[in-house]
Structure formats: C-alpha cells, structure tokens
C-alpha cells in the first residue's frame, strides 16, 4: 500500500477505529494464540543449525527495515561471519520457490527488495514463502548466519535475535491491530523482542534509533556518466513505490528539490507509460524502484540511494548483539 488510512494514525482513536475494535480484538487474539502455539510446541517450528536474526516490524507498510538489514549483513561480514539474507520476495511472481537471487535476477520474479539487497551487499540472498526452506539454500551456499528481512510473524522460522524496526514519525499509529489500526500484532509484542529500533529519533517509543542517510544521485542508465544529475532547486518528478512515499518526498525536499510527487503502491510493477509525465523535467526515484525501472524510465532519470546509520549508542548495542550470536541458540 502507498498510504495508510488516516484514521489508523489518529490518536486517540476516532469513531471509525472504535467501530472496528471487535474485529481488531479478534485479529489480535488469533495472533496471540498462534504465537503461543509455537512457543508451547503445539505448532512445530523449522530447525536451522545456524543463528537467525529477524528484522521485522509490527506496523504495516514501510518502516526502513531493508536498509538496516543491509547494514546488519555488512557488519556481520566485517566481523568475519558469512551472512545470508532470506526474504519472502514480495511482488515476485516466480513459479519456483524457494530460489536464490542473483545480481541479474528479474525483479518481477524475485521481488524488488531481495534484488536490491543482493546487489547492495554481495551476500547470498534466497527468497520464498517458506523462509525455512529458503534459508536451507543459504546453508548450501556456506552461510553461517541468516538475516531475515521481515518475517517477525513468520513463526515457523526459528530465531536467535529479534529486532523490530519502527517509524519514528508514525510510531505505532493509533495503537490498534488491523483492521482498526496499522498493527500486525498487539503493541505489547514489543516487550518480548530483543531490541526496538526507530527509523528516526522517537524517545517515547525506544532509546535506540538510526537515520537513513542519502547518497549522491545515480543515473538509471548503465552507460550514463555518474555526474550530471539535477541540481538542488530543480523541479523534479519524484517517483516512490514504497510503503511510506511521503518520507521519500520529504527527503528530496530536504535536499533542496522542488518535488512533483508521484506515489505508487509498494512493490508496484511499473509500465513505461507510468513514468512519462508529458515534459522534460528530470525524474528521481527510490533505489528500490530503480531496480525495476532501468529499461522503462526516461533518459533523464536518477535514483537516490540511502543507507542506514545507527546513532553511536545504538550501533554499539547492535554490534555487541551481533558479536555474541555464536553463543545464542534459535528459539
């Protein structure tokens, strides 16, 4: 989804949220019961001989997980580990699951975020609805630790470390479960995870946070010169098919661009005509969109890469948690 219903974010909850509270209570109860079943062993988890780090959320839509997953994978590699990344592959339409993701994979087959991670980290990446089966492909590739991009609610996947990413601006919305609010699980689920990390400072929610730092613009065309992108002050068409497009538009405005926003649904399968806006103004899109649009976008098109940068105390705690993975067992 590109934008959430406004009443999901309104505190205190308004009449629409209250009207849906019975359904939200039912949904939340089912999620609690399902998790309890896994904890008690009534529903069997998969088994993996290596530690698993789950990076997920309880808020629907984008919270900035994928850049943090890339940072975690890079950090593990710098520690001498052999990380692999597993993902559901949202948006992918492959007929064969699970499957490995290569740098030249078709995003329509494997999904945009897994392809972005494969290209950005150089780590083995595997996708599939059954993340345990996908993780087995990573073991065959020699990985000694698995990082799951999303999957907090995929309880069949065992985990040694659970990290939840929240949006520092939207927080937990109105604090209610679907369909009355934006939460995939009740808010008290956060008390059971190893670390809650906010994308942007949110002291009322957690002391741990990171920021997304934009890099220099890069052209979509492979044969284009890396320099020559639009200067700040230029009016640009901004394209974002992510969970929270407004955040991308605000980033461009913060860099000095005059933005004509074009929000699309998350994981949107673009067609060429959707990226032509009837003028010769430059187009800037997210890196996640760029992996799908290299052959579709107009000539004057760029993407804005971002990387996660944990603040010092958060970085220290994350590194300490990752360093002791060898002593942790999956649960």
From Swiss-Prot:
Pathway field of the UniProt record reads:
Glycolipid biosynthesis; lipid IV(A) biosynthesis; lipid IV(A) from (3R)-3-hydroxytetradecanoyl-[acyl-carrier-protein] and UDP-N-acetyl-alpha-D-glucosamine: step 6/6
Would the keyword ATP-binding turn up in this protein's UniProt record?
A: yes
Please give the biological process terms from Gene Ontology that the record holds. lipid A biosynthetic process; lipopolysaccharide core region biosynthetic process
| EC top class, as a word | transferase
Q: Which domain of life is it from?
A: Bacteria
UniProt KW keywords: ATP-binding, Kinase, Lipid A biosynthesis, Lipid biosynthesis, Lipid metabolism, Nucleotide-binding, Transferase
EC number in record:
2.7.1.130
Q: Can you state which reaction this protein catalyses?
A: a lipid A disaccharide + ATP = a lipid IVA + ADP + H(+)
Instruction: Cite a GO CC annotation.
Output: plasma membrane
Output the Gene Ontology terms for molecular function: ATP binding; tetraacyldisaccharide 4'-kinase activity
The family this protein is said to belong to: Belongs to the LpxK family.
What role does this protein play?
Transfers the gamma-phosphate of ATP to the 4'-position of a tetraacyldisaccharide 1-phosphate intermediate (termed DS-1-P) to form tetraacyldisaccharide 1,4'-bis-phosphate (lipid IVA).
What is the name attached to this protein's record? Tetraacyldisaccharide 4'-kinase
